[in-house]
Amino acid sequence: MKIELIVPGKLSKHLQPAFDYYVEKLNRFAKISVHFVELGGDLNTEDEKTILKKEAEHIKKRLKDRKFILLDLWGKELTSIEYARFLENTINKLSEIVFVIGGPLGIDDSLRENALAKISLSKMTFTHEMCVILFLEQTFRAFKILKNEKYHY
């Protein structure tokens, strides 16, 4: 099983240890890859719509017409157990699962409209970098649930 995450920008150095930790843990269950694509521009010099459209183009280049699941503030909220079941059902339908997280300004509507599904990590607002860590942690937790393994050690 392959899981890919596409996200604009890059990860801050202070989040790298958590990122590495969860990627290593997840590789026990699936081949995980995270691809950071170029941001859409400078908020100080360009308007939000232009930046969102540019980011959408960078994401679409990476997607190459593949189906994807969008992690979005307006998506469906799931418990960890519900997310595990969602992941299991998706694994049974697709050989590869691609997730997309928006950049600092969110996501362009063109991507939102074409998502296979939309999931919310929370109704609270997090930086897109924190969403990467939360996604990795929740996906690791989901696999532990599906394997009936204890999460806490």
Swiss-Prot record:
UniProt xrefs under InterPro entries: Alpha/beta_knot_MTases, RlmH-like, tRNA_m1G_MTases_N
Top-level enzyme category: transferase
Sorted UniProt keywords: Cytoplasm, Methyltransferase, rRNA processing, S-adenosyl-L-methionine, Transferase
Gene3D superfamilies in UniProt: 3.40.1280.10
Binding annotation for S-adenosyl-L-methionine: 71, 102, 121-126
Chief location bin: cytoplasm
GO molecular function: rRNA (pseudouridine-N3-)-methyltransferase activity
Gene Ontology CC terms: cytoplasm
Pfam families listed in its UniProt record: SPOUT_MTase
Compartmental location: Cytoplasm
Key word Cytoplasm present: yes
Highest taxon above the source species: Bacteria
Enzyme Commission code: 2.1.1.177
Catalytic activity: pseudouridine(1915) in 23S rRNA + S-adenosyl-L-methionine = N(3)-methylpseudouridine(1915) in 23S rRNA + S-adenosyl-L-homocysteine + H(+)
Family: Belongs to the RNA methyltransferase RlmH family.
Oligomer status and interactors: Homodimer.
Annotated function: Specifically methylates the pseudouridine at position 1915 (m3Psi1915) in 23S rRNA.
Protein name: Ribosomal RNA large subunit methyltransferase H
Record organism: Fervidobacterium nodosum (strain ATCC 35602 / DSM 5306 / Rt17-B1)
